[in-house]
Amino acid sequence: MGVTYLTSWSDQEQYNVVQEMEPLMWRRNIQRMKAHGFSGVISSAHDINTIRKWGDEDHELLNVCPGITVETPYGEPFHSGQVRTTSPKEAQDLGADYIVIGRAITESDNPVETAIKLKEEICKTEMNTSKE
């Protein structure tokens, strides 16, 4: 698995570290991943269309997406330092093959309740998808 850039980085932070404009960075990294036999890419779900546009048009690479969040009991998203986050449903709608859920559970006020809520959301999304 290859990593594009961290979900905790903003676009400006990514540029400050990599010092390349996005299209060039995407194309170069995706070409390297394919050349070295990587089976997938770890990225924000928001990057999936860009990854496909700039080098994975044939969808050879699996998309594994961290930065999955859930609403807090107060209706606000739980980010825990992540800048580019999505809900499980949004990640699926954007084309994620797999999602990674960590801090949204482990750093919540009630990890069990949060895990149950996420499971329900994921199952509901899967059921809606299977009906189509």
Segments predicted by a language model, with ranges:
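Conserved beta-strand positions in the central sheet of alpha/beta enzyme cores
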Residues: 42, 99-100
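C-terminal helical cap(s) of enzyme catalytic domains, especially alpha/beta-barrels
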Residues: 92-94, 105-132
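Glycine-rich beta-strand-to-loop/alpha-helix junction loops that act as flexible
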Residues: 66, 101-104
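Conserved anion-binding
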Residues: 1-64, 68-77
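A general structural detector for well-ordered alpha-helical segments in enzyme core domains, enriched
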Residues: 29, 47, 51, 87, ...
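Generic secondary-structure signature for well-ordered alpha-helical cores
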Residues: 31, 35, 53-56, 97, ...
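Catalytic cores of alpha/beta
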Residues: 72-97, 113-118
